[in-house]
C-alpha cells in the first residue's frame, strides 16, 4: 500500500484529498491548528500531525522521517483571496520557498513531491496557456506561485491547475462565496478551465498509482467555461434562488492547455455537467447535516 503525506490537510484541497485517500493509502496529514478545532474534519484512518508550523526549523524533516512516505502532496499555501491581507515575506516563503525546501528533502530521502501550482501564474490576457508560455502575473500571489514551481527535478511533479470546491474552515473560495449570495454579477468573459477538488483528487490518485515516475511541470485542466455559465448551472442543480446578472465588462482568460498531460497519461477530463453534478450533491449532503 502506498504511503502518502498530505501537507495542509484542512484546506479546500487538503481536506478533500485526505478524505478521498484515507481508504486507499496509508495516510498522514499536517494541520495548522489543534485537531480538536476542526469539527468537520475526517479523523479516522489518518495519522495527523497537528499544530504544524512551516516556519519551525527541522519540523518538516522530522515529520517526513516519521512517515517515510512514498509521496508528499503539498497543499500548504496562502491563497489569492487572502494574499493582499497577508505579510509579503510570509507569502513568498510559504508559496515560493517552502516547496523548494520540501523538494530538497524529497531528493535526500528518495521520496516524491507533488507540488500544486495555479493558473494565476498568468495574467489572463490571452488564455489557452501551455507549459512553454511565459508566466506574466505581476501581483504578489501570482509572483509567489511562479517562484514555487519546480520544473527540473526528478523528485517533483508540479501540477499547474485551478480548482473549485467546498471548504471546512476558512471559506474564501468562489463556491463558498457564491453560496452566501442572493444576487451577483456573473462574468461572461472570465474563462475558467479548472477542476473540482474531488476530480483533482482522482487525478493525483491516478498519477501516484499509474505514473509514479512522472516529473516536471504539467498543466491539468478541463474544457473552458465562463464563470456566468458555471455558477448558473450550479445554481440550477441546487435549485437555489440566486440571481445571476450577466456581466461582460470584465475580461480574464487563464484557461490552461493540458494536451501534454493528456498525451502522457491518457487522462480524459470529465464534462462540467458531471463535475457540477457531483459538487451539487456534496453541497446538498452538507446542507442536510446542518439541519
Identify what each model region corresponds to:
Residues 2-24:
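N-terminal Rossmann NAD(P)H-binding glycine-rich loop of SDR-like oxidoreductase domains
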Amino acid at each position: 500500500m502506498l504511503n502518502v503525506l498530505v501537507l495542509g490537510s484542512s484546506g479546500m484541497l487538503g481536506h478533500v484529498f485526505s478524505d478521498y485517500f484515507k481508504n486507499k493509502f496509508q495516510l498522514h496529514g499536517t494541520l495548522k491548528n489543534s485537531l480538536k478545532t476542526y469539527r468537520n474534519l475526517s479523523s479516522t484512518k489518518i495519522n495527523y500531525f497537528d499544530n504544524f508550523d512551516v516556519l519551525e526549523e527541522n519540523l518538516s524533516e522530522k515529520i517526513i522521517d516519521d512517515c517515510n512516505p512514498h509521496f508528499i502532496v503539498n497543499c500548504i499555501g496562502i491563497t489569492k483571496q487572502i494574499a493582499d491581507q497577508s505579510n509579503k515575506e510570509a507569502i513568498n516563503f510559504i508559496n515560493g520557498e517552502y516547496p523548494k525546501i520540501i523538494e530538497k528533502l524529497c531528493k535526500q530521502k528518495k521520496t516524491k513531491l507533488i507540488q500544486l501550482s495555479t493558473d494565476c501564474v498568468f495574467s489572463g490576457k490571452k488564455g489557452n496557456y501551455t507549459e512553454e508560455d511565459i508566466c506574466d502575473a505581476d501581483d504578489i500571489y501570482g509572483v509567489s506561485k511562479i517562484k514555487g514551481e519546480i520544473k527540473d527535478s526528478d523528485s517533483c511533479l508540479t501540477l499547474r491547475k485551478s480548482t473549485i470546491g467546498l471548504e471546512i474552515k476558512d471559506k474564501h473560495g468562489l463556491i463558498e462565496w457564491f453560496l452566501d449570495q442572493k444576487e451577483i454579477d456573473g462574468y461572461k468573459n472570465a474563462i475558467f478551465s479548472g477542476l473540482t477538488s474531488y476530480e483533482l483528487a482522482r487525478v493525483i490518485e491516478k498519477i501516484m498509482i499509474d505514473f509514479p515516475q512522472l516529473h516536471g511541470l504539467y498543466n491539468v485542466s478541463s474544457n473552458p467555461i465562463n464563470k456566468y455559465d458555471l455558477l448558473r448551472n450550479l445554481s440550477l442543480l441546487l435549485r437555489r434562488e440566486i440571481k445571476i446578472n450577466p456581466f461582460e465588462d470584465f475580461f480574464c482568460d487563464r484557461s490552461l492547455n493540458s494536451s501534454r498531460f493528456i498525451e502522457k497519461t491518457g487522462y480524459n477530463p470529465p464534462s462540467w455537467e458531471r463535475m457540477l453534478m457531483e459538487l451539487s450533491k456534496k453541497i446538498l449532503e452538507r446542507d442536510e447535516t446542518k439541519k
